[in-house]
């Protein structure tokens, strides 16, 4: 009996040490090449045709990229202008609104979980048209050291341009936390299964389903436009929050479907508004 107890104790120690050596905040698949990565599950080569290809649930599929509807645009730009005004008067931002997108994903479980599903709040924003990226980047870089009030005015003037400046087929975000040593559930899922849903807590309440394109700033395979997208995403983040000592992973969400989840409206309550029914996406 004593021999069995010694053996079990030894096994427990070995198991504990093994768990200590294994990085549980990581997946059992390596998505990195040293300190960078290239997302292999998204093909952006046909964006000029309005098409994005993605590997979803193990098979490559084509998706037509669509515009966020006018209602979403008016709500988003209007709420952003109102948030800038709150900062001018010394008030904190609201949690509700177009900045905080709740991103639902599914793909691969992190080693500390039995579930491959994940949900996380991500800061979202508008992305200028490809041909306007360099111009906006130059403007932001030349004014980033101005007084905060002046920067608020400049952001307000940019938002007032609406879709004359910003591309209504996409939203942009940053993956702030994922590294070769630590991977978020959102990062893991989007790397292997880039389809996701993004919903906003507000009234009206919009949801869009999208293909997420992840771009590491040091990825040598990025196109010139993709490099500018990553640069812009980091710059607009620093423009408001202050400088950071690193460039973060950029994420562009290409819009495929849009839903109006607003309560109390018979034409909403989860109805798909883009593309309009009965057309299948």
Describe the role of every protein-language-model region.
Residues 19-281:
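Binding-site signature for planar aromatic cofactors or substrates
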Residues 2-8:
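Sec-dependent signal peptide recognition
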Residues 10-18:
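Hydrophobic h-region of N-terminal signal peptides that target proteins for export
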